[in-house]
A protein has these predicted regions:
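Acidic, glycine/proline-rich low-complexity segments that act as flexible tails and inter-domain linkers
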Residues: 2-58, 78, 82, 86, ...
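Alpha-helix C-capping/helix-to-loop hinge sites
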Residues: 46-47, 65-69, 101-104
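Short, structured motif recognition centered on aromatic/hydrophobic residues
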Residues: 59-67, 97-98
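Short, solvent-exposed interaction modules
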Residues: 70-71, 86
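Short loop/beta submotifs within extracellular cysteine-rich repeat domains
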Residues: 73-76, 107
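Aromatic/hydrophobic pocket-lining residues that form the small-molecule binding cavity
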Residues: 77, 94
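Winged helix-turn-helix DNA-binding recognition segment
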Residues: 89, 93
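C-terminal structural segments of small proteins and small subunits
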Residues: 95-114
Length: 123
C-alpha cells in the first residue's frame, strides 16, 4: 500500500517514495477545464516533476529561475520557493541563484523575487 499525504493544502501530495502527485488542477478547475487540469496534474507535475533525470533540488532551482525570468511573482512563485526550501535549496543558495539570474532576467524581477524568498526563508 502507498501512503500519500497532502502537502500544504495546495493539492500536491508526496508518497513515502517522494513521488509527486498533483491534484490542484482538478481541485480548482475540475469540470471547467478538464484537459488543462489533466496537463497540469498528470503531465507537468506527474510525469515531468517525477522524471528522475534531474533531482528535485535542481528542478526547483530551474523552476524558480524560469518563473522569476517571466516576472511571475504571485502565489505560484511563492509555492515554488517553498518547494525549493523543502527540496533542500538553502537560503544562501537561493540568494545566489536569484542574484545570478538577475543579470540575465532583470534587476527589478530579482527584487520582486527576493521579497518573496526572504518571506519564505525567514518563516
Amino acid at each position: 500500500m502507498t501512503f500519500i499525504k497532502t502537502v500544504a493544502g495546495l493539492g500536491r501530495r508526496i508518497s513515502m517514495a517522494e513521488k509527486i502527485v498533483q491534484t490542484a488542477g482538478r481541485d480548482q478547475l475540475g469540470d471547467f477545464a478538464p484537459e488543462f487540469a489533466h496537463f497540469n496534474d498528470d503531465v507537468l507535475f506527474g510525469e515531468n516533476w517525477n522524471n528522475e533525470d534531474i533531482d528535485l533540488k535542481t528542478r526547483s532551482i530551474i523552476t524558480v529561475v524560469a518563473l522569476m525570468s517571466q516576472g511571475l511573482t504571485d502565489i505560484s512563485f511563492k509555492h515554488h520557493l517553498e518547494n525549493a526550501k523543502k527540496n533542500g535549496v538553502t537560503q544562501k543558495e537561493i540568494a545566489a541563484v536569484i542574484t545570478h539570474a538577475a543579470f540575465y532576467s532583470g534587476w527589478p524581477k530579482a527584487w520582486a523575487a527576493f521579497r518573496l524568498a526572504k518571506e519564505v526563508y525567514e518563516s
